[in-house]
Amino acid sequence: MNYRRVFIKNGLVFLTIVTNDRIPILTDNIKLLNQSYNNVIKYYKFDLIAYSILPEHIHCIIKPIIIEEYSKIVKSFKYSFTKNYNVGLVNPTYKRLWQNRFWEHTIRDENDLNIHLNYIHYNPVKHGYAKSVKDWEYSSFYKFVKKGLYDINWGSNTDIKEIIDLDFE
């Protein structure tokens, strides 16, 4: 089956990247995730707009300078993290750290962007990792609060009907 990706110049892309068998290793390896991100941006230029890191998956929105490269960005990120994770392990615990593919969605407009931003930031609550959005430290939520785009209590006293049943994983 041929999978066709949509490429919109100067576009934003929502991504979901999941560990193989949903092994919960990501939040215990934030330093390695940061190293992997820093390795990737040396080769592929993109802005990281928003993110949420959960133990077994990552949601993010990126804006690649060259839109056609977002698949290469994901591949490079997975490779870098896997390489760094396995360094020093005599017998790597997991032969494959990531699911083969990733979920991607091209953001269509401002409303679509807002829905995906809300989904990203509410996701740790949805999965039971935090009681409120502000309690989860592995996301870009506070960056958006600082810019005045979210109230600090967003998600705990806000109607979230538009995102509660969404599943972008």
Regions found by a protein language model. Name each.
Residues 1-169:
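Short catalytic/metal-binding and nucleic-acid-binding patches
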